[in-house]
Amino acid sequence: MPDIMTTYTFLSAKPSIMNNKAPTSKRDQLFAELLTEPSQFSFNESVVDVFPDMIQRSVPGYPTVVRMSGVLSEQYAKPNTCVYDLGCSLGESIRAAEIALNDRDCELVGIDNSAAMINRASETLGSTSKINWVLGDVTAMDYAQSSVVIMNFTLQFIPIERRLALLTKIRNAMIPGGLLILSEKLTMPDPEMDALMINLHHDFKRSQGYSDMEIAQKRDAIDNVLIPETAATHLDRLASAGFSRTRIWVQCLNFASFIAVA
């Protein structure tokens, strides 16, 4: 496995990746007014309109995860294989991979089950990109031979009982030495530490301009939609799916990114 410090050095030497900016969007004010009829969170047109702002202000460390998805893809992607981004949303991670790979002979595929996300990603990048956009359920897909699979904050939205089967399917489609990048919100096994991380995350969101009402209403909307797990649970499941080596490469509060080698 390449040394992680090497990848940080490599990142500094790649200004094209560092300058891969998020798509512009409106400011996220979806929960700024009191909602008399709260609804379950979904990735609809309203969310898509503000998504780049929402995720930047809600997920600590998100820009680093996106940029390093490109760096790691450059180190692991092999010609004549696929590079997948599962739950690609607006395609920031797969676009970072495309820039990093610099016309390497790989098929780049972004998959999401939100038509609003896929349509916006396709419209935004248009003819400037060779990424193939697919609308579909990542748990129901058949995957071609792949060398890199990116899942940034996707598995947490999939029912827990379907997560192992999906990871096993991904592993079985990978070439030996292929890489999975798996980023997730975490829960902590120690209740006091879990409460601390949640409170610190809320403080982070306040520092980004969210009000207490916005934080509370977003939390209520996303409960039972986003189901976090412990880091140990993720590592055990990756081993059960057949990955040979796994580790957390970055963590910020209760958000972490894992790498797993096939």
Name each model feature, range by range.
Residues 60-79:
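Conserved alpha-helix/loop element of class I SAM-dependent methyltransferases that forms part
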Residues 224-241:
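Short alpha-helix
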Residues 84-85, 89-140:
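Class I SAM-dependent methyltransferase SAM/SAH-binding core
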Residues 150:
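A conserved beta-strand element that flanks and buttresses the S-adenosyl-L-methionine
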Residues 8-11, 15-40:
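N-terminal auxiliary segments of SAM/dcSAM-dependent transferases
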Residues 181-207:
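Conserved class I S-adenosyl-L-methionine
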Residues 164-176:
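A short glycine-rich, Lys/Arg-flanked "PGG" loop and its adjoining helix->strand segment in the class I
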Residues 36-41, 45-66:
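Class I SAM-dependent methyltransferase Rossmann-like catalytic core
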